[in-house]
């Protein structure tokens, strides 16, 4: 039986491209929300295959989160991939026409962070170091390259991040068809017929309904 508040690397692997990107966006929002910070600077959405300069989730804030492993810089860009991102593939994601992709160059100028997320990878420590080293080589001696933090998140490390946010664990389980009976994530639970009025009814009382 599944542990209620647990998620595995295999669970992460089962998410499709769009859900994977949404997961990273939700995690960034949750990190900021936990610190009482505005989530307006967490930008994600649109079509997964849209021409977005290589970044799928972008975080722009006045100040990073000192307590966060991935969001400690004020400007962070995530490139989210479902397939494996072997070292040989990395350069093509960072460099275009002999130079850094514009959004990655902008992150370097802002002393930001560029992070690749790959649910297809489950890296040992040496394999993780190889991928980050290839990222550094791809950036090379480009202007402001020394200001840019680079990171790589595989499926195991992404699962670890998710475990810190129980509500997102339930969201992942629902997306892969393994939701728990009697539990659903924040969502529209009531059926509203087409053309019907869809609004919350508020008063000054607290009610608990057993189902």
Regions found by a protein language model. Give the residues of each.
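Mixed-charge (Asp/Glu-Lys/Arg
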Residues: 1-210
């Amino acid at each position: 039986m599944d542990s209620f508040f647990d998620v595995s690397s295999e669970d992460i692997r089962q998410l499709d491209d769009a859900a994977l990107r949404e997961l990273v966006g939700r995690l960034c929002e949750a990190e900021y929300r936990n610190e009482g910070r505005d989530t307006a600077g967490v930008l994600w959405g649109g079509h997964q295959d849209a021409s977005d300069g290589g970044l799928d989730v972008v975080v722009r804030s006045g100040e990073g989160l000192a307590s966060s492993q991935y969001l400690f810089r004020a400007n962070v860009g995530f490139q989210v991939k479902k397939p494996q991102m072997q070292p040989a593939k990395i350069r093509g994601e960072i460099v275009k026409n002999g130079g850094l992709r514009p959004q990655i160059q902008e992150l370097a100028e802002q002393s930001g962070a560029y992070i690749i997320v790959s649910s297809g990878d489950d890296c040992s420590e040496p394999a993780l170091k190889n991928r980050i080293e290839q990222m550094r080589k791809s950036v090379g001696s480009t202007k402001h390259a020394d200001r840019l933090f680079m990171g790589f998140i595989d499926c195991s490390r992404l699962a670890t991040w998710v475990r810190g946010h129980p509500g997102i664990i339930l969201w992942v389980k629902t997306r892969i068809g393994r939701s728990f009976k009697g539990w659903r994530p924040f969502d529209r639970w009531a059926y509203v017929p087409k053309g019907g009025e869809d609004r919350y009814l508020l008063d000054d009382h607290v009610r608990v309904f057993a189902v």
